Amino acid sequence: METVGTKRDLYWLMPLMGVDDGVIISKRGEVTIGWELSLPVVYDLTEEGYDEMVMAFANAAKLLPAWTMIHRQDVFTYDQWKGEYDGNYLHDCFNAHFEGRRYLRHRQFLYITMSSKGSALKANSQSAAFGIRFTAGFPKAQDLWMFANKADEFISVVTSCLHVQARRLTQEDIEGVGIEPGLVDSYLSVWQGGPLRSDLVLSPESMRVFDNTLTGFKVSEADDLPGEVPDVARIGDGSSYELFLSYSSALGVRLDCEHVVNQYILMPNQADVLRDLDRKKKKMTSMQNSPENRVNAKEINDFIDAVHRDGMTTCYHHLNVLAWGPEGTELEIKGKVSAALSSMGVTAVQALSDLPSLFFAGVPGGACEIGKDNLMIQELTSMVCMGLNETFEKDVEGGLVLVSDRMRNVPVRIDFQRRARALKWIDNYNVFLLGPSGSGKSFFTNYFLQQCYDAGEHIFVIDVGDSYEGLCALINESSGGRDGVYMTWDVEHPFSFNPFIGYTGWLDRQGNIRQDESGVTFLMSFLTTAWKPASGWNSDSLAILERIIADFVVWARRTVPPGELPVFDDFYNFLVRQIAPRIIPVRDEKGEIVRLPEHPYLVGELPVTPEDFDVGRFIRSLSSYSATGSYSFLLNDKHPKDLFSSRFTVFEVLKLSEGNALFYSLCVLCIMNAFDHKMRNASGFKRMVVDEAWKAIANETMAPYLKGLWKTSRKYFCSAMVVTQELDDIISSDVIKEAILMNSDIKVLLNQEKNANRFGQLESLMGLSEHQKNLILSMKQYQVYIGMNKHCGVYQIEASRQQALAFESEKEKKAPTLERARQLGSIRLAIDEQVNEEKSVG
């Protein structure tokens, strides 16, 4: 048999009288204050973090006056993902890929209600759901003032653990504004757009609200609970990793249906509770002819002893789950909720005749309608453990990158740059990315750089292997050729640079080299890599080299016409004509010294000898880079091209890497130095990505330049990013460890299954905490770990088919798309045509 209640009946039955300045007042005279809580993200906390949250909540509850009801309400509702389209091809394809995808949203509300023993512990039969008339009895002004102060103190302690933030609910939140429903109307329509637009239908096993059937399960008896309520739920594979969630998380973020979790904690007068328990024990003892009574009497006695012995705080507790869905989904929903409760070791008890009471008690401000028969006496801290203490990934306002929440597979906006630095999670923007072969390293880097470019960043890539060919071509096409410059080295079109850009500022007032000048550091790195003394570079030989550079700058200032730049050939000739004759003595045919230099080259008032600095061998080593040398093109560009007016530039150096190793290293260093100039002079955020090409410069002579670049990048609103795939490369390279890894606050790791047996080395190298290690080992394919010192998370990487084709890095797989692009004259048309063909095939 069904009972139908009209909207008029419903509002007559409502336990609420009204809302005044954000305070809910019930018809029984109870007063409720509420907050919306912001919780930690799933897998964000360690076991200790959950303990801190539980203790903060328990301590806060102990501050409240006797007979205060705490109502913690978690609301999980479905929504559909909606993209923000801006006309950008790949961005819009990404949005279209996810458009309309259903996902769960979560909000948690916390209410405290000032009540009395008689009101809070009334019989279920007196619930508003059964048409009981209310007798008003409003609290005094002094009591309200004291309660408001206690509420402030309560929420201050709740948030003291720093894992939770709270926002006080306002009049508008509760009542709504205009056509926007407030929390009360939203609850009564089970979040289907309220206010309630249909009758409320009651049946023996369910309720129908609006077009949804609502089913309830309750935990209101001690026998329903496991022997001991755990602090947390442990999530893991049983061997390699272990992560933590709330004990009741199976009812929260892991329960895939629309539902509300209501937790009620009534803080009683402790003496009253013990007296009531003692009376109940004596009653049971007097009827010991029943074995059940004897067991109950012993359990009550043990509980009283534990309270006295351990100083425990008692409370009345109730928890229920109200879940709903369209007609015909009742059995599926019941199965999900029942399975979730069973996984917690909790007996699943369906709410039948008392379902209306539970529903009305969930109305904001109606917590005391729960009724005494639905409450059980328990220890406070254990019951607090049954609360939900995590939520889904949340969008970061103004976040740069869209990734996917790995639990819901919908995009969330995150930021590990400006916002992260503002929160003091990082001190620089530098990124170190490690992705073993097959982990999707190139795909993720393309995915990331596309979004950085769309956000207005200047992107500069040094690559080995054409990993960014498709993305660069697409950017070039969409920007009309302004951006997306793809430079591949070959003999006919070699790279050409000028090492003396900004040289006039290289000296201080005393005429000494300024060590903090990037141009100086670059030139020193170039020269010390191009040639090494037999005994290696030492402080004396380096001091001589610095003096030579300083003297060249003085000479160039005098001789190079204004507006022009010296080139490397000028430096080479300066060495030959003005430095070498002042160091190398004149010798006869037998090699005997005939005459010492007439004007010896002095450094620190001491003459430099060939033994101090073998300038002859030095000159011979540099001759390859002079105007007549085999690499004359590299450093002799008097009018260097503006390679960086493009906001997306790729230097592909695979052919270089297959040739002379020394020249390859020096060429990569020159490319990085060119970016250094852009970093210091271009406006906006700049990003340099060195993908595998870093191996060419991972040596001791270039380390000072790299360390300087990585350390100063922050000052120029820049990110230096290294991408690599081999763990051995990091372990074996002190340059990577000291110059790059230690100066990169952002660590990005892709699936590390291939490094599972050597993970201890990676853990030690990167200084990972136990929690970070567990997060990384929990990753599956197409997931990414992003760590910002102590703050970290794992995200799903999912993209549209169009993005996948643009980001493809394997030559055989991307060849058909690139060939089609050549035929059509458009890579975008080629991608669209290929996607449409794939769809037609099915």
Where are these regions (language model features)?
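P-loop NTPase motor domains
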Residues: 47-63, 346-347, 357-412, 418, ...
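Short secondary-structure boundary/capping segments
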Residues: 85-89, 124-129, 365-368, 474-479, ...
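Short glycine-/polar-rich loops that comprise or flank the Walker A/P-loop
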Residues: 65-66, 106, 455-457, 482-484, ...
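Conserved P-loop NTPase
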Residues: 768-821
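Extended, folded cores of ATP/NTP-driven motor/assembly subunits in large transport
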Residues: 1-389
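Conserved P-loop NTPase motor cores
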Residues: 417-439, 443-450, 460-462, 466-468, ...
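A short, charged
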Residues: 433-457, 819-842
